[in-house]
A protein has these predicted regions:
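Feature captures the catalytic ectodomains and active-site-proximal regions of enzymes
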Residues: 1-380
């Protein structure tokens, strides 16, 4: 596995005083599937050589595995660190809903419109992973295939192996519509199904594993994280052993992580005086202005939070290419007026954005720890 600077260039490793932005024209999660399923005559330099011209490809996504976290723990992941490749960028926000949709569709967030974890849709805030609003299940009121209608995997219908409980979720319907879903309940079944399908001559198989992300959210980046990385590395080793000789196994992720622990603050009251509602998530918080308050909101947010967040208006983010060179009208309508994009390890709380436990590890922002993810490959 190459060093970071050798793979993407030292200039890509920005100081976190400046936001790290995706490389939408190069090594990015949005470009992996097109490179594998619709390759050009000239292979992109960011695609590891073992993935070139393989008769069969297995793409494994390890949710939550950032390049910086892996690079600091090479001794725990001998299989991953022996593979060819290095870091690429994911998309913004650095969040599962957005990145997995970019991976499956081969489109930027501005094109596919799943532009955050919690997005503004028709006057409501939709939690994309749960596909719920304040009124509950939103699969009827906000049909997933209408909110995101682009076909996954360039219209191919590959087998996709994911957790069985995700099969009928709104998010699965939005970003994996039309694929051949194979559910698993324990990791060994994920490996077994990948082996079965590749031995049946499937040319492309996609497998999703969420253990690292789950552990990091609950326990942070410490002993539990290290143990889960060891387990994930073993899964990849088992996949390489299970597939036919010559199969290319490609491993990537949707985002990295930072440990926020108790470093969570509410949006300042003087800022909230100009806010009608909030969307996004703790490290990429969208503020939707009260009518006529957009300029006042921008000024107040910069004054109160400018030291510990990148404060940007919707236009500044769109014009800056954060979501890609094109942002559709539908995607634009799902954004707030001002974003608080957290620096360092800070997160912004919001009463309507809660879960079953307090998050220790988080993601969503534009730091290098969250933006850079591995793209690795090896032949069985």
């Amino acid at each position: 596995m190459v060093a970071a600077g050798d793979h993407v260039g030292a200039e890509a490793w920005v100081d976190d005083e400046q936001p790290a932005l995706p490389d939408y024209s190069g090594g990015c999660t949005a470009n992996i599937v097109p490179a594998l399923l619709d390759p050009c005559d000239e292979r992109p330099p960011w695609l590891p050589e073992p993935a070139w011209d393989a008769d069969a490809v297995v793409l494994v996504l390890l949710d939550g595995l950032g390049w910086e976290q892996l690079d600091a723990r090479r001794h725990l992941a001998p299989t991953l660190t022996s593979m060819a490749g290095g870091p690429i960028t994911t998309v913004l926000p650095t969040t599962t809903a957005t990145a997995l949709t970019s991976l499956s569709t081969g489109l930027t967030p501005g094109e596919h419109g799943v532009i955050g974890y919690r997005i503004h849709v028709h006057g409501e805030v939709l939690n994309v992973l749960r596909w719920t609003t304040a009124a509950g299940d939103a699969r009827q009121t906000i049909p997933p295939q209408k909110l995101q209608s682009n076909l996954p995997f360039l219209g191919h219908r590959p087998p996709v192996i994911t957790r069985a409980e995700f099969a009928r979720t709104g998010f699965t319907m939005a970003h994996l519509d039309g694929v051949r879903l194979e559910g698993y309940r324990v990791p060994s079944t994920l490996v077994t199904e990948i082996g079965r399908l590749t031995r049946a001559a499937e040319p492309f198989v996609y497998g999703y594993y969420d253990g690292i992300d789950k552990v990091c959210h609950e326990y942070g980046i410490a002993d539990h994280y290290d143990a889960e990385l060891v387990a994930a590395d073993r899964i990849v080793a088992d996949v390489l052993a299970a597939v036919p000789r010559g199969t290319a196994v490609v491993v990537t992720s949707d985002h990295g992580q930072v440990e926020t622990a108790g470093n969570v603050i509410p949006v300042d009251a003087e800022v909230q005086a100009h806010v009608a509602l909030q969307s996004g998530e703790g490290r990429f918080r969208w503020l939707h202005a009260r009518p006529g308050h957009a300029a006042l909101l921008r000024a107040a947010a910069e004054d109160k939070h400018g030291e510990h967040a990148w404060v940007r208006t919707r236009d500044e983010i769109v014009d800056g290419g954060w979501f890609g060179p094109t942002v559709t009208p539908d995607a634009l309508s799902r954004l707030g007026d001002v974003a608080l994009v957290a620096k360092g390890t800070l997160a912004f709380s919001e009463p309507n954005d809660t879960g079953p436990f307090s998050l220790v590890g988080r993601h969503g922002s534009a730091t290098s720890a969250e933006l850079y993810v591995p793209l690795l490959a090896a032949r069985a």
